[in-house]
From Swiss-Prot:
PROSITE patterns: SCORP_SHORT_TOXIN (PS01138). GO terms for molecular function: ion channel inhibitor activity; toxin activity. The keyword Transmembrane helix does not apply. This is NU-buthitoxin-Ptr1a. Gene3D superfamilies: Knottin, scorpion toxin-like.
Length: 34
């Protein structure tokens, strides 16, 4: 079970955002391992 929330890390967050985008801080990319 993967946590879909992006970490507080700016780099990680940017990676998630570039991957597919996020809504209200929740990473929408299931492969994101933030």
């Amino acid at each position: 079970q993967m946590d879909m929330r992006c970490s507080a890390s700016v780099e990680c967050k940017q990676k998630c955002l570039k991957a597919i985008g996020s809504i209200f801080g929740k990473c929408m990319n299931k492969k994101c391992k933030c």
